[in-house]
Amino acid sequence: MARSAATWDPGQYLRFGSQRLRPALDLLAQIPLDAPGRVVDLGCGAGNVTAILRGRFPAAEIVGVDGSDTMLARARATAPECRFEQADFFGWEPRDRPDLIYSNAALQWVDGHPTLFPRLLSFLAPGGVLAVQMPAMHATPLHQVSRELAASGEWSGELRDVIPLPGILPAMDYWDMLRPRVASLEMWQTTYMHALQGEDAVMEWASGSGLRPYLDRLSEARKAAFRQAYAEAVRVHYPRRADGTTILPFHRLFMVARMAGERAIA
C-alpha cells in the first residue's frame, strides 16, 4: 500500500545537497547502458539528478516522476528540457516501456515492496534496467529517536497517528525477489561518513527527510519545539567532533537489475 506523501521543502532537503548527491552519482556510474531511449527518474524530487541524467544520456527522452507538486515545480525549473509527471509510485505507469527506471533515495518512503518492485520490472523494455538506491537507516538513532520522541508523553497526543517510515526489507529479500525475474542483478551496500557542518546538523538533515511526517502534523511553534527536542536527544548519538564537524554514518543499499533482451551494453 502506498503511504501518504509528506510535505516537502526543497530548500531544506537540498541544504546538504552535495552529501545527498554522491550516492546518486555512485548508482549512476554502475548503470550498464550506453544509449537508452527512454529514462524515468522515479521519485525525482527537485530534479537535480534528473538534470544529471540528461547530461549522461543526452539523446534520451527523460521523464521525472514525483508525488510532490512543490518538488516538481522546483524540478521543472532545474531541468526544463525534461518532462515531469505527478504520480505516486503505485499509481504511475509509463506511456512507453522505458529502458531505464532510476530511483535514488525514494522508494524507502513506501511499503509494499514485494508488489512494487516486480511491477516496476514489468514496465521495462527488453534489456532494460531498474537501478535503485535506498537508505538503510531504520534501525539507527537517526530514526529511532524520532519514533521514541513521538511516542513520549509530551508529543503522543499530536503525533500518535503518524505512521513511521516502514524501513526497507533485508537485502537478501530483494535478491530473492528480483533475481528470478532478471538476467543479471548487482547489489551492494555502502556506509557514507557524511561530514555535516553547522549547529545541530543531524537535526537539520532529518528535517529535510525523515522528520517530515512528524513536522507536517504540528503548528509552526510546535515544529520548532519538536526539532529542538529531537536535536537534544540525537546529539548524544552523533556528537560534534573537535573541529566542529558532525559525522553521520549513513548506510545505503544499491541494486541494479537488468532484464533479458538486447540493449546497448557498455
Give residue spans per PLM region:
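Short glycine-centered segments of the SAM/dcSAM-binding site in methyltransferase folds
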Residues: 38, 128-129
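Short catalytic micro-motifs in class I SAM-dependent methyltransferases
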Residues: 105-106
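Conserved class I S-adenosyl-L-methionine
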Residues: 1-37, 48-52, 71-74
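Class I SAM-dependent methyltransferase SAM/SAH-binding core
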Residues: 38-94, 115
